[in-house]
């Protein structure tokens, strides 16, 4: 049963809704604060660019984000208000590097009609009050006292009902607002009011301005001494103030919704319009009076939702419809006449209108191909989990036991040799002049035995460790310079070396430490430990990159890892790992300036410890499971940053982000050995030994999800994959802004599913929109077809009265129209249904069968249908059952009866939900998403006693996701390994307007109960930012009701357990009555779902 569901984010929201700039984390630190609907990010502006400081979830959808500075404060505070009428004031705690809540509260009113044009939240420039316009006809005031604390809020009646914008004016003795509104004749005006705090009322303000541009939609208040306000229309920009100064300029018709102030005195503003054009508006002024306005074209950016001017001509452009950008404004134009230079792009998947899941490598791992972005910023995005290795060369080699790369001299930036070790020999490969790998010889090395370790050393030497000796060989002559032999009767089992030190272990627990001095190997220390040694490492992590003062040693028998000091091999710390599995690989490493000891076991588990590089102390012990086979650890470098590669049956890259260790799976089946091989021909590449093969490849950017962009310059709205023809097809449309009239042209486009090359295009008729697309086959026909459902959207019709179903075959990479069928409405949804085609057309569900005509051609013939919907927008099928998501009437269940060849309604959910997506989790449980950002599940009551109960779909789960879901589809972003318990858990992927990709996993009941307990324990330990309540945030909420979340768990909260400090983890584990190791392991397993 899929009643118990776990909801988790695989890709966080990326649509930028707000941004602001100020001194938040320190008086002299300039911060960019970005809101992405339900998250905020704080960045620090440094000479090197923007540096991320913190990225936190907010338990609400952010409606207002404003910085302000109360009296007597040296840095800014942050005011946030949410769509569900909660607010908070945040302050930065520099010592703890975290957000403090200064104030919070609820500003909802029992009565009142929520505003149509969205909430407005503004702060008086002199910090006397916060103003909120949340309900028609009301202006809510939260006053500050003279210490900067918030006092009780009150409402003032506002006679303007259709408010478009409100701002506070600068430089007013009494707090003054300016209101842009529309009257009942659709004319637009501005009016000013003073806020009388004592009387809790408005006083008619100093001025007003009537009959503005019909498209006036944005107010920009100008700082003192100029003062006044700029009113941005669609065809004019106007400046006016209390001294009845009135200045206006015409502009080319556009809709401007985003602005950013450049100078503190407010004489220049950046304006972004709906076509992504950036303009500079200049107020010319003399003696503190505005004399005129000038507007200049700067260039093109993404379509801006927010513009924040940072410093030195650098601007952050936040976008909801495309990638956000960091741009530089240049004084000179480039050859295309643009002053805008893009410094950095921040990927945004929003709005995800549709997606399909494609398993290209047939590994049971889905890639998600999304229809993302809007208007000119529309694109397809290919999203996959894990890090890809792009193979450049490979050769068949059996039985590889180890790999090392060597340089031709110590200071050479590039690697020259690849040392490949086998059970009874060692072979040497080198790059030749044609950049090909060929076999070579290093005369001083012993090629007749297995190599245990190899390394470049100081004085241009090479080190080779074998079972019976350590050899020093000259880089230049390649001859043997010095040799240390293992004592009679002993052989070396494991070894490690760096540029000046060698550490090796022989049988009987002997540990020998050598140093290279004057091109000689000197035995410095020899000790015997009480057990056999299983692995050693002395990778330098201190100041000196050529010398380590610490060594790590893994032990048999007592299953421990020890930190020893060098050169005297004194024990500093012994850490018992517990269990019976021997450590197989230890590694000392520094990632993002933090030192770690990593210790990998023979069963695929990995321990990580924070390591104090000067004292050798170990803290913050954590254990994760990476695979089931022994792991070997190696560092490598990519784009100048160090990471760790863990070779095993599930190869993993361990990397650090925001000083936290993250694990990303590598998209390879099994890796036995890896070493970095940084050659001039293929920089930053890796040599990888798999079963029977050695390959050289480059590695993707190190991150958990990889996103590839296919820019379209138009908007894709429906997409589908067809494995047989190796193609993707999608419906898209382009805005034509050439004429006075805006028009759209709609297409069906075909792409190669591997290269994403455009293969073919089919243009739809004028006014015809593509609404749905599927790949399917029909009874008694072996071909596979793309079926496209369309609608004719005519300007004079409220609802389309005609559409078409188009059936295409892919022939030689081209779309061939085989059949078309006219319909009496929009074809909102199509499904393959038992060898037939099921269509949702306006209010009706219609079934078509595929008929062969006498002339050998085909046609779609109507078989039966079912009425009874307002608009049937979404359909899913399973066997003979059909689930319908309606515009307003929630979810209903239909069944196709073969004998009568009819479709009948079995049951429905009688709640009024405006649906945005549906999916069948299994035969009994169906999931839906609706337009108040909730998701819910319903159950078919086939065993109920009465007809009435059987006819009702029972709501069994409810949850506030806080995201508008456009599509739910079965699939997985990760490899499903049949041996792991997570491999058996069914998952559904969802995509949202804010660019979130999420996973809904249906859990077994006992696991759900355990995690539910963990969630309620964690709520006590992890407080919401601004003290916002998690329980309230996740409660199902619409206009009619609010009810507690049930049968859904918040995976993001549960997985944040892994970010807690060790002490907090232990407290949570104590509350759960479960050992901390087991709790970590269970939560780690869940992260494998995405």
Swiss-Prot record:
Keyword DNA-binding found: yes
Q: Where in the cell is it found?
A: Nucleus
Keyword DNA repair in record: yes
Keyword list, A-Z? DNA damage, DNA repair, DNA-binding, Nucleus, Ubl conjugation pathway
A Gene Ontology BP annotation from the UniProt entry? DNA repair
Note the InterPro entries from the entry.
Beta-prop_RSE1/DDB1/CPSF1_1st, Cleavage/polyA-sp_fac_asu_C, Quinoprotein_ADH-like_sf, RSE1/DDB1/CFT1/CPSF1, WD40/YVTN_repeat-like_dom_sf
Q: Name one GO cellular component term.
A: nucleus
Q: What is its main location?
A: nucleus
Gene3D superfamilies recorded for this chain?
Answer: 1.10.150.910, YVTN repeat-like/Quinoprotein amine dehydrogenase
Gene Ontology molecular function, alphabetical:
damaged DNA binding
Q: Which residues cross the membrane?
A: none
Entry comment describing in which tissues the protein is expressed: Expressed in proliferating tissues. Highly expressed in shoot apical meristem (SAM). Expressed in roots, young leaves, flag leaves, and panicles. Not detected in mature leaves.
The protein's assembly and partners = Component of the UV-DDB complex, which is composed of DDB1 and DDB2.
PANTHER family, alphabetized: DNA REPAIR/RNA PROCESSING CPSF FAMILY (PTHR10644)
> What exactly does this protein do?
Required for DNA repair. Binds to DDB2 to form the UV-damaged DNA-binding protein complex (the UV-DDB complex). The UV-DDB complex may recognize UV-induced DNA damage and recruit proteins of the nucleotide excision repair pathway (the NER pathway) to initiate DNA repair. May function as the substrate recognition module for a DCX (DDB1-CUL4-X-box) E3 ubiquitin-protein ligase complex.
- Family indicated by similarity: Belongs to the DDB1 family.
* Name of the molecule in the record: DNA damage-binding protein 1
Recorded source organism is Oryza sativa subsp. japonica (Rice)
**Gene for this protein?**
DBB1
